[in-house]
Structures are given as C-alpha cells and as structure tokens.
C-alpha cells in the first residue's frame, strides 16, 4: 500500500490525510478479492522501517489502524472474512494492540470457513522475521527439541510469521517503486511481481483486477522449462 504521502502532496493535503484515503481504499480491494475468489490478501500496513517517520504521522497511523478495525469488523464478519496480522506489534500503543487482538479473536470465532483471509503486515520486516526465526531455531537446537540434520527449507517455514498461510502467488506494488522493500523475501521466492505507477489511494478495483488478469496470463515455471 505505497504512495499515500505522495498522493496527499499531489492534493495539497497532509500525509495523515493521505493515509486515511489509503485506509479507505482497503475495503475496495477486499471486495475485489471476494468478487474474483481470491483466498488470501496480505497488506503491508506498517513496516519496521516506518518507526523512522515523524511522531505525529505514526500517531495518525495507529489511530487509523484502530478506526479500521472498529469500523469494519461487522462488515468483515458478515461477509465471512477472517483478519490476521503478521509482525511484532508489542511496541504498538496498548489500545491499538487491544483493538487488533480483539478484532482478530472475534473474526476467528465467527468466521469458521472464511471466503477470504486478510493479513495485515504490522511492524513487519523480513530481516526482523528472519532474525527471530533463527533465534528460535537455535533455542530449540540448544534444548534438544530438534536435530540440526532435520532442518530444511520446509522446516524453516514453520518458524516464520507466515507458517499458517501459503506463499504469495502475486505481489503488487503501487506508486512506481520497483522493489520489495523487506517484504516477504523468503516467501516471495517464486512470486510473480507487478509494479504500477498508480498511487495506493487511486488503485481501484479495476486496476487490481487488471493486475490479476496479467498475472493469470503468465507462464510460471518455478525454475523449470
């Protein structure tokens, strides 16, 4: 979800205004996923690098997170949409953490066979995820819970935040940037990439479906012929 700040600048608005516009666009893309039967949607909402942002901007982002969860919870449940997060949210404000955890618990209890799982990447960065995975593997080796010889790529996946979700088939980045920026680097090994100059608040359902259509026409060989 990239380009909120630049969108705000283009409209002579504050960065917080841009983030709000970006937040409001999330539901449009969620609806698009439901319309074309996509089962998982991961949104990069707050990266480990976002702590470098100005204090007021971070406060606005945390407030928007709370508002999003509280405002959309009924709609998500009524449409049988499960909400989860990946990343370490322990450094977030306590009231934000409480809202996130309560919403996730409620959707888990009420959405038994979800048509879509929405995953918000919050205080997420792959380098941080990898660090934590390596530490936890080392702890388990030290405690004789695992044998080093049994460690393979499938084993490593069980120590990642995304252990319960499939690897992404397609990664879409808005705003004209052509890099992954520390996002799901292990999981994206064979993901298709789609880059667009459109800023996130302007990224419509039609734009999303166009990206999916282009992806559908690609020949994924996974290193083979």
Short names for language-model regions:
Residues 1-225:
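Flexible, compositionally biased loop and terminal segments
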